[in-house]
Amino acid sequence: KTYKRAIGVSSDSLPRETILEQLQEQGYQTGLISLTTITHATPASFYAHVTDRDMHEEIAAQLIDVEVDFFAGGGKKFFNQREDGKDLFAELLSKNYHLDTLELSKPETGKKNAYVLADEGIPSKIEGRGDYLSEATKMALDYFNQKEAPFFMMVEGSYIDWGGHAKDAEMMISEVLDFDKTLGVVLDYVKANPNTLLVVTADHETAADDRGLRALLPNRSLFPGRGPEGGPAARVHPGRSRDVVRRG
């Protein structure tokens, strides 16, 4: 337990080892894939230790030190447009990374691989992202599979949450479908490599607003008794427990 907005620290702001760091110590390969900036709260929670989630430049610097084997996401500006003037891309190259800031180029087997492909987050599905999430996931799985060492990877379908906050039904649904496609890639891998554990969960729900569905379902409401006019649900993260599904 810790406080709101903390990343990788206890309630008294002391660093606490993450699951990624623990598995690194045991010889695991590690990977992180996100649609947001790679310094955003969810990916950062696997490697960073800061007192506030918005400390993006410090989080980026810590990512360099952790040396994750494969990571992909956005957030260029936190690496090469920093207030301290540091060029973290140069530091990645000095640590023998294959770095690409333009596209998901083929990973280099003998190196760690970093893909930072947007100044902010990667575009949403309805903004023309394409198959970035499933392709990055497939690339990472192929990369890890070339070595004998086990691996740990976190893949985040980030914008399902964002669509809910924005009350944008089209965005939310398209992101769920894209995450489902990515999940299919992982399930195929698990089927071919049965000694693999897949865990699918969420860190929270995101309550939406059924008014966001009016354009798609003009005569229906997701909330019984509301009618087609719709109305707001909670605009925050509900405190309910989330499901955990596993395979393998």
PLM regions and their residue ranges:
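A post-motif C-terminal structural segment
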Residues: 1, 40-248
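N-terminal carbohydrate-binding/catalytic regions of secreted carbohydrate-active enzymes
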Residues: 1-10
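PP2C/PPM-type serine/threonine phosphatase catalytic domain
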Residues: 7-8, 34, 91-94
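Gly/Ser/Thr-rich helix-start
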Residues: 9, 32, 158
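Aromatic/His-enriched, Gly/Pro-containing loop or helix-boundary segments
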Residues: 10-14, 51
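Mobile, glycine-rich extracellular loop/lid and propeptide segments
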Residues: 13-17, 21-24, 29-41, 63
